[in-house]
């Protein structure tokens, strides 16, 4: 699964996901992409599950690009622990995704296969998405 090799600080504030994506909202690599339509935190496990679903449907042909990276440590305290005594330990990694952000791109396969692969990948994610296609020049 994806996670940073090294971070400056172990823990971060929760923060909010406000506004539309400021970058990463255009197709840069592939012909088809999966665009996020609502703000959400997506975990590294969800990204990996979506990637596996996409590559399995494409039968390992073509190419898949992951355009989001989980760089936010999400902390949790153990169950049945009293309140207080500091913030919990980092439990997993997540990525903040703004509306309009391209999360996955695919290329090198037919349109129907690409759309079906991205649809199956979208089923693994907790956000509403849309499959987009590069306009032929």
UniProtKB/Swiss-Prot annotation:
UniProt keyword annotation of Zinc-finger present: no
One GO MF term: structural constituent of ribosome
CDD domains: Ribosomal_L16_L10e
SUPFAM superfamilies, A to Z: Ribosomal protein L16p/L10e
InterPro entries: Ribosomal_uL16, Ribosomal_uL16_bact-type, Ribosomal_uL16_CS, Ribosomal_uL16_dom, Ribosomal_uL16_sf
Gene Ontology biological-process entries: translation
Subunit field text: Part of the 50S ribosomal subunit.
Family listed: Belongs to the universal ribosomal protein uL16 family.
The name this protein goes by in its record: Large ribosomal subunit protein uL16
Species: Methylorubrum extorquens (strain PA1) (Methylobacterium extorquens)
Gene name as annotated: rplP
